[in-house]
C-alpha cells in the first residue's frame, strides 16, 4: 500500500476495501457473474481500485510485488473496458507502466465520449462533493457508483 500524502490529498484505498467496492458491482444473471462495463476510476492514485477492477471484472492479474500486469494478461489488460484518470503525473506514469489505460489527468475537466456503466472512486477528500457530482454527470442512466 502507498503512503498517504496530504499535499496531494491522496489517501490510498486499502486492498480489502477496494475488493469489497468492486465486488459489490457484480451482477448475477442465469448463474453467471458479470460486471457492468465500461468502468471508470476517476481518481486512480496508486491503482488499488483499478487493480481490483482488472482482477474481478476482466480476469487480469497484476504481480503484487511490481504492480505490473502479468505477462500472460497484457492483451486482456489492453482490451479491458476500464478507463483511469489521475491528476498526479507520477501516479499516471506508474498506472501506464502497470498496464492501465489513462484517459485524462483531471476528472473535473474530463469530457468523455461515452457514459460509464460503473464508477469506482476514492476521490480527493477536499473535492469529494465535486467528484461525486461529476460522476453522476458521466454515468449511464441506471449506472452504479461506489465511493
Regions found by a protein language model. Give the residues of each.
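Class I S-adenosyl-L-methionine-dependent methyltransferase catalytic core
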Residues: 1-147
